């Protein structure tokens, strides 16, 4: 599978604040760092800066199969819902919508205001999947990582990507937990 990563300056701040991960400013450095961390094969990961307007995901002639905006601020969500594109992320989302590609948005805020909900409804009516980062607890998570895996598993399911992050509902492990 091929991954194109688009990130914002805010993503750099959040990564440092919430995960103690320092993302370099230059996309090439981020690509090298993440490629090594996740053992990406050559050509499997490509990173684009926020204003690389000539990047493949910015064009309808080379759209990705699917796109995930995770996490998605309400500002970005509103821009995407309105068809505004002041960043590469917003432009790529606009391309995904206009080309009929799968777009999954994972909103970051809580609680939602009426305006947030209206923007999400507008996107959902366009076929965009709104997937709040709300983990389930029926699998009896033992760590924050388990909660993150739950949400990541739901995202991968939306993309049709096979994974073994957690047992599925009805699997033997799931039945054992529910019968206790």
Protein language model annotation of sequence segments:
Residues 1-104, 111-180:
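A cross-family phosphate/adenosyl-ligand binding-site feature
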């Amino acid at each position: 599978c091929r991954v194109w990563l688009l990130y914002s300056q805010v993503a750099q701040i959040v990564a440092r604040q919430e995960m103690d991960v320092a993302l370099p400013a230059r996309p090439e450095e981020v690509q090298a760092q993440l490629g090594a961390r996740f053992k990406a094969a050559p050509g499997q990961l490509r990173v684009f800066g926020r204003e690389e307007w000539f990047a493949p995901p910015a064009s309808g002639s080379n759209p990705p199969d699917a796109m995930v905006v995770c996490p998605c601020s309400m500002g970005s969500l509103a821009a995407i819902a309105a068809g505004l594109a002041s960043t590469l992320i917003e432009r790529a989302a606009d391309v995904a919508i206009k080309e009929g590609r799968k777009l999954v948005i994972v909103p970051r805020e809580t609680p939602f205001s009426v305006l947030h909900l209206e923007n999400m409804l507008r996107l959902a009516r366009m076929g965009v999947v709104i997937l709040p980062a709300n983990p389930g607890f029926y699998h009896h998570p033992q760590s924050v990582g388990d909660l993150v895996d739950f949400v990541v598993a739901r995202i991968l399911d939306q993309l049709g990507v096979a994974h073994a992050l957690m047992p599925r509902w009805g699997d033997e492990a799931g039945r054992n937990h529910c019968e206790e």
